[in-house]
A protein has these predicted regions:
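Shared catalytic-loop signature of beta/alpha-barrel
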Residues: 23, 222, 228, 239-254, ...
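Metal-dependent enolase-superfamily TIM-barrel catalytic cores that perform enediolate-based chemistry
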Residues: 137-251
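Hydrophobic faces of well-ordered beta-strands that scaffold small-molecule active sites
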Residues: 52-54, 147-153, 174-178, 201-207, ...
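Structured beta-strand/loop patches that form or line metal/cofactor-binding pockets in enzymes
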Residues: 1-48, 53, 57, 71, ...
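Conserved, mostly hydrophobic/aromatic
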Residues: 3, 49, 68, 119, ...
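Extended hydrophobic packing segments that form well-structured cores
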Residues: 361-394
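N-terminal amphipathic alpha-helix/helix-capping segment at the start of soluble metabolic enzymes
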Residues: 2, 129, 133-144, 353
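Metal- or metallocofactor-binding catalytic centers and their adjacent structured scaffolds
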Residues: 5, 45-130, 393-394
Length: 394
């Protein structure tokens, strides 16, 4: 089996109106979540008729996608490692998130091509089809057929957030993750959520490190004592593990770190710096760090970028494999974006998303929707292009 053609289509699918934040927080960095952050839908074709689908993280540079595609053309997908997918990488070619331009994250050296996620999914889709099994089987085998998910919201007024939480609960969701910052009305927001949904509704607060200091985090945490907050995620800079150790010692509210790299998970476990992890990365990378968390006795969830259907399906497959993934993942892009670009949406039952049955990824592109949201111009050329083994392309 040989990869004989790769087609890439750049798309922009906006968030639904008012899906992210209250009007008073519309100027918050990252509030639009899609402006200037296009995605790529990848179709990888083989010489025996299989087609694998992939989706990049928002904002992945065109150059990274093109270099990855060129490296895979002519390769046998049955002889590639999903765990160690070695694609050409220029450390200067990274997406805006990893430069700290979307959310406040520590800027660090990126060790792989940022398009790796998208191509890993497409290759896994091909392998699953070739072997007649769902992608989760390639990742180690599912331990569950559905994955717990929680709804998501950006920064909102207490009144708006209470209404959003109630709407989510009425749709079956058991919890909500919210974005926040140091000087927001935290108690009033949380009180509005619990007044609307009751004390069993789960609430995750994620300031993207914008509680700033240990002292401010302690102040906010003590203000919320007595309310059943599930977790503070990344309250302060996450490279300061000393701060997390102290906060865990002094706060009643559990703490989570949002991590990707195995060495960071090892360091956090060694310091006993977190109660929970929000893990990101490729499918195989998530399974790897999820196993590490399981050995350490730490529960995890899978973070997202409020993505489209292909990435969300990949998250469901990966989460189904990791026994420690028992917290609510935010696999809810199709509730918040105008379209998911797949023919049949993922199936949600209560606060769970069903793992697609496969074979492969188990989703099909909606070509009409793809055409509707296509972007004509990319970073350095047309928004849509393809290459093949004959040397032709467009």
């Amino acid at each position: 089996m040989i990869i004989d053609r790769i087609e890439v289509r750049r798309v922009h699918v906006p968030m639904k109106s008012d899906a992210v934040a209250s009007a008073s927080f519309s100027g918050d960095r990252g509030a639009s979540f899609t402006a200037g952050l296009d995605k790529h839908i990848i179709s990888v074709y083989t010489d025996d008729g299989l087609v694998g689908l992939g989706e990049t993280w928002k904002g992945t540079p065109d150059l990274a996608v093109r270099r990855a595609a060129q490296a895979l053309l002519g390769r046998d997908p049955l002889r590639l490692s999903l765990l160690r997918l070695d694609l050409p990488h220029d450390p200067a070619v990274i997406n805006p998130r990893d430069r700290g331009e979307v959310v406040a994250v520590p800027v660090r050296s990126i060790v792989q091509n940022p398009a790796t996620h998208g191509f890993e999914i497409a290759l896994a889709d091909i392998l699953g089809q070739a072997y007649g099994v769902p992608v989760c089987q390639l990742l180690g085998g599912a331990v569950r057929d559905r994955v717990l998910v929680h709804y998501w919201s950006g920064r909102r007024t207490p009144e708006d957030l209470g209404a959003i939480a109630k709407m989510a609960q009425e749709q079956g969701f058991a919890g909500l993750k919210i974005k926040c910052a140091r000087d927001d009305p935290h108690y009033e927001r949380a009180r509005a959520v619990y007044d609307a949904c009751g004390p069993d509704f789960r609430l995750t607060m994620d300031p993207n490190m914008r509680f700033d200091t240990i002292e401010d985090t302690l102040r906010i945490g003590r203000e919320l004592e007595g309310l059943p907050i599930e977790v503070f995620e990344d309250p302060v800079p996450k490279d300061d593990l000393d701060a997390y150790v102290r906060l865990r010692d002094e706060l009643e509210i559990p703490l989570a770190l949002h991590l990707e790299h195995p060495q960071d998970v090892l360091a956090a476990v060694a310091r006993d710096a977190a109660d929970m992890f929000n893990l990101r990365g490729t499918m195989s990378g998530f399974v790897q760090t999820g196993y590490m968390a399981e050995v350490a006795g730490i529960r995890v969830w899978r973070g997202s970028g409020l993505d489209l259907g292909i990435l969300d399906a990949s998250y469901a497959h990966a989460c189904s494999v990791v026994a420690s993934c028992t917290l609510g993942s935010d696999i809810v892009g199709n509730f918040l974006r105008e379209d998911d670009l797949i023919a049949e949406p993922l199936v949600y039952e209560g606060s769970y998303v069903k793992v697609p049955a496969g074979p492969g990824l188990g989703v099909v592109l909606d070509e009409d929707a793809l055409a509707k949201y296509a972007v004509d111009q990319g970073d350095d050329g047309p928004g849509s292009w393809s290459i093949d083994t004959t040397g032709s392309g467009k």
